[in-house]
């Protein structure tokens, strides 16, 4: 999800002048990694693969035109664009104003640094306008306690109900439904799980 959101931020920043995006991550290293993906995607807009198709060539030409019109100035924590748009990464981003905010791994932050988690909500999230977008994606670290769990539980209770522009819309993408994570079971012996994992999946 975070790579998709990073590419969406790049797209919105290129085609909307003065559009400000923020990436809040559990560590600055993780946040700057996402900035690196955005920078790589921008640099690759005019990439032509070996044995290109007509579509490849057309996309590369479009990318060349975009890069000619809108230049990017990347740094470790920020990508600034010549159209006034900007993408910034940090661990709380308090004091900034964003139209699009991605909060990654709030479960981890809430479990290990609850005061910083509260600051993310009261500072960065509350500074996003009501017509802005906040994407909050996280594992379930911390279990059934902490700020992330409270927010997730509240959004789960709203599933199927009318939502205002200020309500969270809940999406769940379970990792165990990804075929890449399946183990091949032996027909003769099957596959068994330790008791703690069985309890995890039952919860």
Residue ranges and their predicted role:
Residues 1-203:
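Phosphate/NTP-binding elements of NTP-utilizing enzymes
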């Amino acid at each position: 999800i975070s790579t998709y959101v990073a590419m969406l931020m790049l797209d919105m920043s290129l085609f909307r002048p003065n559009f400000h995006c923020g990436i809040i991550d559990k560590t600055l290293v993780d946040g700057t990694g996402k900035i690196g993906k955005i920078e790589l995607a921008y640099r690759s807009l005019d990439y032509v693969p070996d044995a290109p198709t007509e579509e490849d060539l057309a996309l590369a030409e479009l990318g060349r035109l975009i890069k000619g019109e809108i230049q990017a100035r990347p740094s470790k924590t920020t990508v600034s664009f010549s159209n006034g748009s900007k993408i910034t990464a940090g661990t709380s981003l308090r004091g900034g104003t964003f139209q699009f905010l991605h909060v990654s791994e709030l479960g981890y932050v809430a479990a290990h640094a609850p005061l910083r988690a509260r600051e993310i909500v009261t500072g960065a999230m509350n500074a996003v306008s009501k017509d802005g977008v906040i994407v909050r994606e996280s594992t379930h670290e911390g279990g059934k306690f902490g700020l992330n769990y409270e927010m997730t539980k509240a959004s789960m209770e709203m599933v199927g109900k009318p939502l205002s522009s200020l309500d969270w819309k809940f999406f769940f993408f379970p990792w165990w439904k990804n075929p890449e994570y399946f183990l091949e079971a032996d027909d003769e012996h099957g596959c068994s799980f330790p008791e703690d994992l069985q309890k995890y999946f039952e919860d």
